[in-house]
UniProtKB/Swiss-Prot annotation:
Cysteine-cysteine disulfides: none
Source organism per UniProt: Oryctolagus cuniculus (Rabbit)
Cofactor annotation remark: Binds 2 magnesium ions per subunit. Is also active with manganese (in vitro).
Annotated positions binding Mg(2+) 2: 47-48, 99
Free-text activity regulation comment from the record: Activated by manganese or magnesium ions. In the presence of magnesium ions, the enzyme is activated by bicarbonate. Calcium mildly increases the enzyme activity, also in the presence of magnesium ions.
Entry domain remark: The N-terminal guanylate cyclase domains are required for enzyme activity. Fragments containing the first 470 amino acid residues are fully active.
Gene: ADCY10
Binding site for ATP: 47-52, 99, 144, 406, 412-416
UniProt name for this protein: Adenylate cyclase type 10
Length: 1610
């Protein structure tokens, strides 16, 4: 039975009937319109307060999760309760109007007395519902009820597509008046109702000076049985459910199918509702908080109450209103009698109906409706209120009776303006500002205090939309601000400068057209051009058109000529007339002067000839006259005519301009939005003219967006997070950027404060990334920054999550216009894509699209790519490349395009779409062009639908949420998924096998791979070989492996390179967000930790930090649920925090985090010396145990144990490096213990890779500490371990890793020849293994070794490879290192590979790159090198700029070769500064010298500074000594440096040392600009290769450090 009932209730007719009252559903009406029906009844008007305030609260909410749906739930919770009461008591809900409803009890007149009692009982029970409740949102919901009874008329009216009905009569007026009198929780009876009711049953209270009364309560006699009374009353109600249907709320729920009835009922329902009823996919689609424009029309009549009298007037008005709205996609939402009149609530921008220029169209419609209705007989006053903004549009009510309605402050404002400003068209300030119409179309009205809307801002009267020629008012709309430059538009201005030059030098016309969408800053460009175009021999005329200009014949030329003739400054028509007479007397006979009357608003007497002339002839005469005037004018001065919004140029003006540019030399500059329809022939001819330059505007680049934000906010820097949000969200469109900033400011997200000095702030995790992005250099040089000392910075308010912010209403509107212009199926695709995220794969989209086939999807995607909704990319690399730059402006060659045959064009379009389809098939990554579209489309979903879609996405993505096949599909955090149960899908055996092998469990087959030709370790290290021989054998082993890799037929080498970065971006990042949306916090945390680990692998410390913060938020919420897995997650969390701090050079913080992680992993690291020695003793025993037991096979640890061990190894590996950085003697014991604990933990894992890494780390620790015997032993152990590995997959990677790591150790220790040999082999291996992340590291180190050996040929080869790799992979660190070596070559090798300017440009462009900025060492080296360059040139201002930037990075100490390389350069810069101080005989020179010497000595004394840096450091120490007159120590340091260079084979330093030695002790003096002469003569590498320059001569191009011992003041 229930199923049958559900089926019935799901019928289309039942769903339509739910939108209509029984009065219509069961009505019997004549087909003529208007038609009138009469009856008696009781009316109840219920007004619910609190909803508008709630709608406002939701519509201005910051975050996307507070959507329409939550609002619908709250609204309908209350309204459905009221509806239910009304239906139970036999009422019929006639209308819902926003937050009010009107109900009717239709009965014969004699039944009114009893029915009024029933209605009063119903009213009191409704009040009872709200007496005690308070909404969950903390809003007080209260109701006011008015009751009336008597004669009622019903009027049905409409056109052939849509019907409306109204109830009219005294009772309708009375019920509204009664409700108006009511206060909260009152029930008021109208005078007539009080007259007709059973007074004995009702206790009332009189209202002073009123005939209406207030009901206190019902007072039935003791014997009264209400149920019996009620049942008796209901027998008089025609459609009250009884008998079999007595349990139903409404009889209409059981309507049988009836096509005729269905057809007639459909006419009463809005088209969008019918669409939703037909298409079940769209359920819930119409409930939205969305920006709309409300047009409230009120008609007052001479004879108010007679339906038959006013019916025809309402019918005429309705037909006209409908026809006007249809043109602009507006809809009549409601019609009702309202305070002495009939009101139409019209809405523009309903779901599916959003159109561009909505506000303009609404005003245009309002004026049209006003003009028409004012002429209709019997209508004596027309008042219209127009307001724009966000309102709630949605279905409100109960499942059995509801309506589509709009609720919000803007609806109230429009209604109030309509009532308080009768007889005119009014609009609010939002509509005024958004109309893009000239101000003279409006007049600001005096403010009135309007009930219920508070201060709604200024109110304007719309005076009409006929363009009046207000001379001097059509100027450009924006004003140029001297202090506000045009940012990021140099290329566009260049087009103007070139065209201007051509125009001034030639005698023919030029046209420059800038085409761009709204918001691209076209008006700003023209404003700048107007300023630049000012000159002595030419006149500039600049005008801005509006939408209305298009409909005014010859308007553009009218304004141009008024300016040329100087009429724009005339105050009065007589002044204009005199001016015109003087200008045209020689060109035009006096009797023809009256031709100018209409066009220039003058009053010359009309001659007989002109009165006989046809309009066409008059126009031709005028055009001829204007042409003569312009020909005459250009002989005296050139004319530059600038037109903004040129898409609104009228047809006649285009024709004249086309003729004009052929006849008269004139320069026309236009900006225009893309034409919506094909432009007229004249406009096309201008675009195709050979002298036209047509530029399509591109977006502004990220750097300029940042500069713009700093300028708009008047700050010196903004947070990195804000920078990323604005760059991504604005897509380089200036208007988008402004709106986003306004929105943030509105929500108080931006906090401004004085800039703190670097020293003041103590480093904590929260301020670890003092990531303030400053404007670019060029911007600062333009002198627009703040004055020194008063610099303010912008910060984000705490706890703000930018990516969850709701888009600003203005941008939402733009997206909705685009969405609503699509077909329903395309809308559905975009909305589904929005759930997946900003970037998604075609596979996942196909998975979640309901009932689509692949062909349909590809076709739809191609169309959406063509209309710039989506971009498609072949792979992650293409995507990353595209995101770095925005599309720039470009020139369109319309002339060459026009030469194609027309049928070819149509064919070309089809061909283009086909090509796009095949491109989409090839590209599997799709991304929204604009993030705002994704956010807007996402917000349209209902909560349950969202959840279901997120779940689908999560299930699909989860299968691929691991490392790529190249990296053997493991977790980014080893064995992570074994410790935490997070999967939705149950694992199949294949997946488990795959994941197990990824962590180094070889299968039998893998071990049996042929190892022929590879020596066994017994063969390698059998006898007592010398270190040199062992070295040779090791190199031989690597050569054998390389040969095997190149020639083996087995699949040793992977088929493709590492795809982990792509998997991170398109699988794991979205998956974490899906779990977050599903409220699965533990799963989201798991993936946030994976993401962090992945970003650390990719060298992106900033993103790792951001996602750790996301994880921290979740950890706090999960802390309440104590479980073991959370302990592991916490440990991993601190371990990852430690890694980020370590990479950022914040060692105190890193140590704290790593200790916390170890504590959670049950491996406490000692805090005091007693505990230290105890632990050391234990670890030594443990090590001895592992070494002796190694021969015996013991069972490997379980997976969960392995997860712990891997984390412990990572922590210990960082800890020993941190302790090695410290000078205090006891720290070396801590360092040694950490290194040993790492080794023992690795041995426990029984994993070859872990053991080998630990052996090499242990060797490295002893290398740096200077224990020769120990390090050698462990390097040999590591080698022995790799001989036993299977040469496949991970085995080969371990071999490559060992070669690279040994090469690094040898470079640090200064064994340059061995470093090069090992590095070359490692480079070849990683190249074959296609692992760019490892490959670039080896190439960088190899380049460094070759550079120190002066092996330039090989060096340049490696640099080329490094460059190719950096370009192919879009890899910033390898590119930065490339430029670092290029600077080195110029500074120390004496030739040029890439120019200094190119290197400097790279640094300026990329210093804010998030990977480079937070990578310790590289930027320090680059800044220091530039500082050295300027220091050598004695350009001290530039030196200080870069030296100070380097200084801020020195404190980020990390024990890496890059950091020490950077520090040694920084010290060199400081030494040059010291030399300047000594020369200037500065008082602080002596102290500075001593301080510098100490710093250099401590660097040499530090364990972690590799010996490879000693020669340079001793060289600098020697220079300081000679500057300070300490010859003895100078000799000592010089000789030490020379000796070390000799031992290491450091040819570069040795050569420079010898030159310094010779120079310092000679009597020669140095010219001031010696380095300038040197750099001017630096040869390019090409000259050296071609033999034009001898390589030995090049070595003399070294900087000679200036000394002047004779004048030494010390």
């Amino acid at each position: 039975m229930n199923t049958r009932k559900e089926e019935l209730q799901d019928r289309a007719i039942v769903r339509i009937a739910a939108h209509l009252p029984d009065l219509i559903v069961y009505g019997d009406f004549s087909p003529q319109r208007p038609s009138v029906d009469y009856f008696d009844g009781v009316l109840m008007f219920v007004d619910i307060s609190g909803f508008t305030a709630m709608t406002e609260k939701f519509s201005t909410a910051m975050y996307m999760d507070r959507g329409a749906e939550q609002l619908v739930e709250i609204l309908n919770y209350y309204i459905s309760a009221i509806v239910e009461k009304v239906l139970i008591f036999g009422g019929d809900i006639l209308k819902f109007a926003g937050d009010a409803l009107l109900a009717l009890w239709k009965v014969e007149r004699k039944q009114l007395k009893n029915i009024i009692t029933v209605v009063i009982k119903c009213s009191l029970e409704i009040h009872g519902l709200f007496g005690t409740q308070e909404s969950e949102e903390g809003l007080d919901i209260r109701v006011k009820i008015g009751l009336a009874a008597g004669h009622i008329s019903m009027l049905v009216f409409g056109d052939e597509t849509r019907n409306h009905f109204l109830v009219i009569g005294q009772a309708v007026d009375d019920v509204r008046l009664a409700q108006n009198m009511a206060r909260m929780n009152d029930v008021i009876l109208s005078p007539n109702c009080w007259q007709l009711c059973d007074r004995s049953m009702i206790e009332i209270e009189r209202i002073p000076d009123q005939r209406a009364v207030k009901v206190n309560f019902l007072k039935p006699p003791p014997s009264f049985n209400f149920d019996e009374f009620f049942n008796k009353c209901m027998t008089f109600m025609d459609y009250y459910p009884s008998g079999d249907h007595k349990n139903l709320l409404r009889l209409a729920c059981m309507l049988e199918s009836d096509p005729d009835l269905e057809l007639s009922l459909q006419k009463y329902v809005m088209e969008s509702i019918l669409k939703q009823i037909d298409d079940k996919q769209l359920r819930g689609y119409l409930s939205e908080l969305r920006p709309v424009t409300i047009v409230f029309v009120n008609l007052m009549f001479q004879d108010q109450n007679k339906a038959e009298v006013i019916g025809s007037a309402i019918q005429d008005a309705c037909v006209h209103i409908s026809s006007v709205l249809k043109v602009f996609r507006g809809q009549i939402n409601k019609v009702f009698m309202f305070d002495k009149g009939c009101s139409f609530l019209c809405v523009f921008g309903f779901p599916g109906e959003k159109a561009p220029d909505e506000v303009t169209h609404a005003l245009e419609s309002a004026v049209d409706i006003f003009d028409f209705c004012s002429q209709v007989h019997k209508i004596h006053t027309v008042s219209i209120g127009v307001a724009s903004g966000i309102v709630f549009c949605g279905i409100v009510g109960h499942t059995v009776r509801h309506e589509y309605t709009v609720i919000g402050q803007k609806v109230n404002i429009a209604a109030r303006m309509m009532m308080y400003y009768p007889g005119i068209v009014t609009c609010d300030s939002v509509t005024y500002n958004g109309s893009n119409l000239p101000p003279y179309f409006f007049k600001e009205l005096p403010k009135k205090l309007m009930k219920g809307v508070g201060d709604s801002g200024p109110v304007y009267q719309c005076l009409g939309l006929n363009e009046k020629v207000m001379f001097g008012m059509a100027y450009l709309t924006c004003n140029r601000n001297e202090g506000y430059p045009l940012l990021g538009r140099d290329k566009e201005i260049k087009y103007f400068m070139c065209t201007m030059k051509e125009f001034l030098m030639s005698n023919c016309s030029r046209v420059l057209m800038y085409e761009g969408l709204s918001g691209f800053g076209k008006s700003r460009i023209l404003m700048e051009i107007e300023y630049l175009a000012q000159g002595e021999n030419h006149r500039t005329i600049a005008i801005a058109l509006t939408k209305v200009s298009f409909h005014q014949n010859f308007y553009t030329i009218q304004i141009l000529m008024a300016n040329v003739l100087g009429l724009d400054t005339c105050k009065h028509y007589k002044e204009r007339q005199t001016n015109l007479q003087n200008k045209v007397k020689t060109l035009l006979d006096e009797k023809f002067h009256c031709l100018l009357n209409d066009i220039f608003h003058v009053q010359f007497p009309i001659s007989r000839e002109i009165s006989k002339m046809s309009t066409f002839r008059k126009q031709k005469q005028l055009e001829a006259l204007f042409m003569k005037i312009l020909e005459q004018t250009v002989k005296e001065e050139r004319i530059i005519f600038i037109i903004d919004e040129a898409q609104f140029v009228d047809y006649a003006s285009w024709i004249f301009m086309e003729k004009l540019i052929r006849t008269v030399p004139i320069f026309i500059i236009m900006s225009l939005s893309p034409f919506t329809e094909i432009p007229c022939a004249a406009a096309s001819a201008i675009m195709k003219n050979r002298n036209t330059t047509y530029v399509t505007l591109g977006a502004v680049q990220p750097n300029d967006i940042r500069n713009k934000v700093c300028l708009d906010l008047n700050v010196s820097s903004i947070p990195k997070e804000l920078d990323l949000y604005l760059v991504e969200g604005s897509c380089g469109i200036p208007f988008y950027c402004e709106e986003l900033v306004k929105n943030l400011d509105h929500h108080r997200v931006l906090v401004f404060q004085q800039m703190e000095t670097e020293e003041k702030t103590k480093v904590t995790w929260n301020n670890l990334f003092k990531n303030f992005i400053k404007p670019t250099e060029e911007f600062k040089m333009s002198g627009l920054g703040n004055e020194e000392g008063t610099e303010e910075i912008c910060k984000l308010a705490s706890g703000v999550r930018l990516k969850n912010l709701s888009p600003p209403a203005s941008l939402k509107e733009i997206s909705l216009v685009q969405l609503d212009s699509m077909s329903l199926s395309h809308q559905m695709l975009v909305r589904c894509a929005a759930i997946i995220g900003l970037t998604f794969t075609t596979e996942l989209l196909f998975e979640i699209l309901p009932c689509w086939n692949m062909k349909m999807m590809i076709k739809a995607l191609a169309t959406l790519v063509e209309s710039n909704i989506f971009d498609c990319f072949r792979d992650g690399k293409d995507l990353r490349l595209a995101l770095k730059q925005n599309a720039a402006s470009f020139e369109v060659h319309n002339r060459s395009l026009s030469l194609q045959p027309t049928e070819g064009i149509a064919h070309g379009e089809e061909e283009e779409l086909r090509e796009l389809e095949s491109e989409v098939i090839e590209c599997h990554i799709i991304r929204f062009c604009k993030p705002m579209m994704q956010k807007t489309a996402y917000e349209l979903w209902l909560k349950d639908q969202k959840k279901a879609m997120h779940l689908k996405c999560a299930r699909f993505l989860e299968e691929n949420a691991h490392r790529c096949d190249h990296c053997r599909s493991g977790d980014f955090i080893p064995y992570h998924h074994f410790t935490v149960d997070i999967r939705l899908n149950t694992l199949d055996m294949d997946t488990i096998k795959k994941m197990a092998t990824s962590h180094g469990f070889e299968t039998e087959e893998e071990i049996k791979i042929s190892r022929a030709g590879i020596p066994k370790n017994s063969e390698l290290f059998s006898e007592n070989l010398s270190p040199e021989e062992i070295g040779e054998r090791i190199l031989g082993f690597f050569d054998v492996i390389l040969t095997k890799m190149k020639t083996s037929k087995e699949d040793i080498i992977p088929l493709e390179s590492c795809q982990c970065e792509e998997i991170l971006e398109i699988v794991i990042l979205p998956l974490a967000q899906h779990f977050l949306a599903l409220g699965e916090n533990n799963k989201a945390l798991y993936y946030f930790l994976e993401i962090t680990s992945a970003y650390l692998t990719l060298g992106d410390n900033y993103m790792a930090y951001m996602y750790l913060n996301e994880g921290e938020r979740l950890l706090k919420t999960l802390k309440k649920e104590k479980s073991w897995s959370q302990t592991f997650e916490s440990a991993t969390f601190y371990s990852l925090k430690g890694q980020v701090c370590f990479n950022m050079g914040q060692m105190v913080l890193a140590k704290k985090m790593l200790r916390k992680a170890l504590k959670l992993l049950n491996r406490i690291f000692p805090y005091n010396l007693i505990s230290l020695f105890l632990h050391t003793h234990m670890e030594k025993n443990r090590h001895f145990h592992y070494v002796t037991q190694q021969a015996q096979e013991s069972s490997p640890p379980g997976k969960k144990r392995l997860a712990h061990l891997y984390q412990q190894t990572a922590c210990f590996s960082l800890l020993w490096q941190i302790y090695s950085l410290n000078y205090f003697f006891h720290h070396k014991y801590y360092g040694h213990l950490a290194a040993m604990m790492e080794l023992n933990t690795a041995l426990e894992t029984q994993n070859d890779f872990q053991i080998i890494k630990a052996y090499l780390d242990y060797a490295m620790y002893h290398h740096l500490a200077g224990y020769q015997g120990v390090w050698f032993k462990y390097e040999v152990k590591a080698m022995e371990q790799i001989f036993n590995l299977p040469l496949k997959g991970e085995g080969i990677e371990i071999v490559a890793y060992v070669a690279g790591k040994l090469s690094y150790i040898k470079l640090m220790m200064g064994y340059l020849d061995l470093a090069i040999e090992l590095g070359a082999r490692a480079h070849k291996m990683w190249a074959l293994l296609q692992n760019p992340n490892q490959h670039y590291v080896v190439l960088c180190r190899l380049s460094k070794s070759l550079f120190l050996k002066n092996r330039y040929k090989h060096l340049i080869q490696m640099l080329r490879r490094l460059w190719d790799l950096s370009v192919a992979e879009g890899h910033i660190i390898s590119k930065a290192f490339f430029y670092l070596v290029c600077l080195d070559i110029m500074l120390y090798s004496g030739f040029v590979y890439r120019t200094f300017e190119e290197c400097l440009e790279f640094i300026i462009q990329n210093e804010d790159n998030r990977i480079l900025k937070f990578q310790s060492g590289l930027l320090l080296g680059l800044y220091s090198s530039i500082a050295i360059w300027y220091g050598r040139l004695q350009e001290w201002d530039n030196f200080y700029v870069f030296s100070n930037r380097a200084k801020t990075l020195v404190s980020r100490r990390t024990p890496t070769i890059l950091y020490y390389d950077g520090v040694s350069r920084y010290m060199e810069g400081q030494v040059l500064q010291l030399q300047k101080q000594i020369e200037e005989q500065s008082e602080t020179a002596q102290d500075s010298g001593v301080e510098l010497l100490k710093s250099l000595e401590s660097l040499v004394a530090q364990n972690t500074t590799g010996p490879v840096f000693y020669p340079r450091l001793y060289h600098l120490m020697a220079y300081i000594c000679i500057l300070m007159g300490d010859g003895q120590n100078c000799d000592l340091f010089l000789n030490t440096a020379l000796k070390l260079s000799e031992i290491q084979g450091n040819v570069l330093e040795k050569c420079w040392l010898n030159m310094s030695k010779e120079w310092w002790y000679s009597n020669c003096t140095l010219t001031e600009d010696q380095w300038l002469h040197t750099i001017l003569s630096l040869p390019a590498w090409e000259k050296i290769v071609s033999g034009k320059v001898n390589i030995h001569d090049v070595q003399k191009n070294k900087f000679l450090m200036r000394v002047n011992i004779l004048d030494n003041p010390f």
